[in-house]
Amino acid sequence: IMPSLVGSEMCIRDRDYICAGRIEQGTMPKDPVMCKSIVSTPLADKVAEHYGVECRNVLTGFKWIGDQIAKLEAAGQVDRFIFGFEESYGYLAGPYVRDKDAIIGSMLICEMAAYYRAKGSSIKEELERIYAEYGRYLNKVDSFEFPGLSGMDKMVGIMSGLRENPPKDFGGDAVVKLSLIHISEPTRLGMI
């Protein structure tokens, strides 16, 4: 029985499989682009770099990956997009869908499992090969819910506090880098 893999681990396998397969089949576009959410594993950046793929890190939510596809499309370069993912098991393996697509993700996992089985390997063994090549990354997901308007107020307070007093350590580990991400896109909250 194979232990379950978290979303980032599965996406890393898919990313490596797609890149290696496109190179093997001669279908890798010039200057290929992959996108991932900022909460997804940084191991994806290393895999992308290995294959000469630009890795764009976007905010959480598939609309941001879709936005990158739209930008490529507007520039007449949509064929450069080869893969997008979030750690929540969401995949895009081409520019034809602009939102999380479980169907293509399921198909990719099945295809990948069959491919590696035919080679005498497995998804887990291939993930271990990737870790041996690039280093092992810890992937852990914590989720917090803040329902309703009071929840929104609480989130705003937490974020303000983090901006005004950035943490020196987090979970017992020293903070070595802090990135403040701010978007100026208006939200629909003012419409409520």
Model-flagged regions — what are they?
Residues 119-184, 188:
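Catalytic-core signal marking the mid-to-C-terminal active-site face
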Residues 1-7, 12, 181-192:
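Single conserved hydrophobic/aromatic residue that forms the stacking wall/gate
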Residues 2, 28-31, 165-166, 185:
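Intrinsic-disorder/low-complexity coil detector
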Residues 8-9, 13-133:
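Phosphate-binding chemistry for phosphorylated carbohydrates and sugar-nucleotides
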Residues 92, 107, 138-141, 191:
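A ubiquitous, low-specificity "background" feature that marks scattered single residues
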Residues 2, 62, 88-89, 94, ...:
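Generic secondary-structure boundary/loop-capping signal
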